Amino acid sequence: MMRTQCLLGLRTFVAFAAKLWSFFIYLLRRQIRTVIQYQTVRYDILPLSPLSRNRLAQVKRKILVLDLDETLIHSHHDGVLRPTVRPGTPPDFILKVVIDKHPVRFFVHKRPHVDFFLEVVSQWYELVVFTASMEIYGSAVADKLDNSRSILKRRYYRQHCTLELGSYIKDLSVVHSDLSSIVILDNSPGAYRSHPDNAIPIKSWFSDPSDTALLNLLPMLDALRFTADVRSVLSRNLHQHRLW
């Protein structure tokens, strides 16, 4: 009898210790992600010279169109864990939305350095969100990324896309009629099929905590705002992913 009680007590202790260890690992991974997110971030925004200020004053302020999924964030919903997300990786935030009268929870992971990226480029461009996702989901994600900064006020969703052969195409003329001043950042070449000369390609992101793709784009985006027509630069086969 005593032996049975000892075994039960030992099993209870082992189960409790396992749960405690899992919780510790969860907290450790979350802390590591936070450190990685911010430890290498640096991009010096130096004051413009009089010549640069004059040059910038002669061109229109550009519009940077931003995709969400696999460009700025990655998400998965209840019961679905894609193999690209490491088990136990904590989400940055959880969204609860109702789709077709069914409540769904989305676990959202932010691409490394996305907050810093948005903070910097919002000083250079008018930012516009254009996602092929449903508005009820895309709007909630954009709200979280905006974080009350009012930098992601203009938004376009699935209903603003064109469906062609099973793919959602983003028509940039919906955003602005002057395509010389629009840049789109999207991981899906099919999304900007109609405007390849306005696109900056970026690799799809799912879970790599060491990813620096957004940081790597800052020098280019900094320079691109001085051009009279962004297509004069972006038309040089960048949409073929040869340089990325």
Curated annotation (Swiss-Prot):
Serine/threonine protein phosphatase forming with CNEP1R1 an active phosphatase complex that dephosphorylates and may activate LPIN1 and LPIN2. LPIN1 and LPIN2 are phosphatidate phosphatases that catalyze the conversion of phosphatidic acid to diacylglycerol and control the metabolism of fatty acids at different levels. May indirectly modulate the lipid composition of nuclear and/or endoplasmic reticulum membranes and be required for proper nuclear membrane morphology and/or dynamics. May also indirectly regulate the production of lipid droplets and triacylglycerol. InterPro entries: Dullard_phosphatase, FCP1_dom, HAD-like_sf, HAD_sf, TIM50. It catalyses: O-phospho-L-seryl-[protein] + H2O = L-seryl-[protein] + phosphate; O-phospho-L-threonyl-[protein] + H2O = L-threonyl-[protein] + phosphate. It is an enzyme of class 3 (hydrolase). It comes from Mus musculus. Its EC number is 3.1.3.16. GO terms for biological process: canonical Wnt signaling pathway; gamete generation; mesoderm development; nuclear envelope organization; positive regulation of canonical Wnt signaling pathway; positive regulation of triglyceride biosynthetic process; protein localization to nucleus. The chain crosses the membrane at residues 7-29. This is CTD nuclear envelope phosphatase 1. Muscle specific with lower expression in other metabolic tissues. Belongs to the dullard family. GO terms for cellular component: cytoplasm; endoplasmic reticulum membrane; lipid droplet; Nem1-Spo7 phosphatase complex; nuclear envelope; nuclear membrane; nucleus.
